Amino acid sequence: MVREITVDENYQTVRLFNEMKKGDIYKVPYDKKRHNGIKLEASRRNRDLRLIGTLKNKMDVKYRVSATEYPGFSAIICLK
């Protein structure tokens, strides 16, 4: 499901990741600092999933972030 997120006073990156399900794509308006924060949260989540054994190797990811898939947006993609 592709969902466009509006950034307001209630926006929290962690909350977005908590409510994502397999196959979801969230589009957040692009801002360089916000994009870096989203990338960091995705790498943290992927690292933690590797440590508990859900993801098997370094190349295996659950969350992916793209700035080029949807121009003007940071796309957060939940793969698994």
Q: What are these regions, as identified by a protein language model?
A:
Residues 1-35:
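An N-terminal amphipathic alpha-helical segment
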Residues 12-14, 28, 50-52, 61-64:
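A generic signature of intrinsically disordered, low-complexity regions enriched in glycine/proline
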Residues 22, 44, 55-58:
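Intrinsically disordered, low-complexity peptide-like regions
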Residues 57-80:
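C-terminal edge-of-domain segments
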